[in-house]
Amino acid sequence: MWSQVYDPFNNIWLSTMAAAIPVVVMLAALAFFHIKAHIAALMGLVSALVVAIVGFTMPTDTALSAALYGAAYGLFPIGWIILNVIFLYQLTDRKGQFKILRESIAGISGDRRLQLLLIAFSFGAFFEGAGGFGTPVAVTGAMLIGLGFAPLAASGLSLIANTAPVAYGALGTPIIALAGVTGLDMLELSGMVGRQLPLFSLIVPFWLVWAFCGFRGMIAIWPAVLVAGAAFAIPQYLISNFHGPWLVDVGAAVSSMVCLTLFLKIWKPKSIMTSANGKFDGGNQSGASVGGGHNYSRKEVMTAWTPWLILSVIVLLWGIPEWKKALDGISLIKIEWSHLHNMVQKMPPVAAVPKIEEAIFKLNWLSATGTGIFIASVISAFLMGYRIREMLAVYWETFKLLKYSLMTIAAMLALGYCTRYSGVDSTLGLAFANTGVLYPFFGTLLGWLGVALTGSDTASNVLFGGLQKTSAEQLGLNPVLMAAANSSGGVMGKMIDAQSIVVASTATKWYGHEGEILRYVFFHSIALAALVGILVTLQAYVHPFTLLVH
């Protein structure tokens, strides 16, 4: 068994710089050298293996096994989700159903800003709550590009929108995992996050529209933006504090969709933005002259929406713990990963006591969200009149379309698992933990870093939750506050994690432009994370914000 070493150079800053090499290599390759994503990911993976084996003294076979374990996880369940979401999109697009759906959304409003709120923010939050793990970005990115948004806008905006709901994604999985790894009360953690994120659920819709069309365009529709945000934030606070983490996103998303749709029946902006570039360039008409209508019958519209309604119902069903448990009971295959399972030991101060790391690959082929999406796709295909041979042809074309994306995701997860099991992630985390009185701010950024590295708020909570609790207790801070801050800060890192960026580029048919997407969203990510850090610092030290911590 190998024990992790967090300061192999006996100098925390040298060790931290070494630990940062894999991430810097991959992000620099993407953002500055315009190298294709799958090549950049492989470069990052090679550098991670070198740092782990040479710098952090991880056994070679263990490091390689960790990378293979991550690659397997990248393909299943994450790649499996993306493959089947795009399969459904291709099925609907070939039959002309997506065109009808697109125009029916324009029927609610022809304004691009309002379409963005409905799809990326409200509808996307529903998929985050029901499925998580890349589902919302894949679905909303595909829908936005189908509506005529530019690829960069569709990719970047779907990523920015997928922030506020992330902490309660997949029916509360990040909070449940955080409670498990810290030993803190799950309902207390749920409530604490619910006293941090609702403010950002109000801010993000404004931020989203501002990112698309600027301040002037955002202010012009502020009543609708406020309705979308408030209708999400209020249920988010109430459900998280008085019920638990399970239905926060689903309830808040449905509330936001319904309230915004009803509001748009009685309110119209003075000028309708119909241009796809987010500018008032003549592609706009007065609100009085444009109602956003279409020429399709109600039956045709319902037929076009049916595949996505089936998808919503099945993804929600697949997220219910009891249903998932029942499916796992007849299908789950657990594989103890050779040369890795119980071969690595996490050490203090990252863990309170030495802790042996498991590595069990769960092949939950029936209960996986991607399988639910596949079933929804097949049902929808039959309803649209596809024959089995036609379905198989579309599926093969979808696979060929996504082959490099799947390769990229596998390589990125291989990198992430290599840094996780080698302790490289934890070295970066400890650098944040050594910030003393500023720890509430930098501890929040630690959550942001965790999600940026792992691609998952759940994984970040598992990785750094124990460290947050231990550091908070040593500094005299409330451990519930800092554990919750890890999750709340983490949501802002979701838009820059390489896995999500590849999902977005794939969904918008813009693979190979990941560097441009990263540059587009990076400022938004770090700025929002800093704002969360400021709020957590106020909650730690400044009255009356301290009253929110109990």
Residue ranges, per PLM feature:
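Structural signature of hydrophobic alpha-helical transmembrane segments
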Residues: 7-21, 74-78, 131-136, 188-202, ...
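Juxtamembrane helix-boundary/capping and inter-helix hinge elements in multi-pass membrane proteins
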Residues: 93-98, 110-111, 144-153, 180-187, ...
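Juxtamembrane and boundary regions of transmembrane helices in multi-pass small-molecule transporters
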Residues: 167, 171-279, 488-550
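Membrane-embedded alpha-helical segments and adjacent helix-loop junctions characteristic
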Residues: 65-73, 78-147, 385-471
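Active-site loops and adjacent core secondary-structure elements that bind or stabilize anionic groups
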Residues: 237-333
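Hydrophobic mid-bilayer segments of alpha-helices in multi-pass membrane transport proteins
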Residues: 18-27, 37-56, 79-85, 225, ...
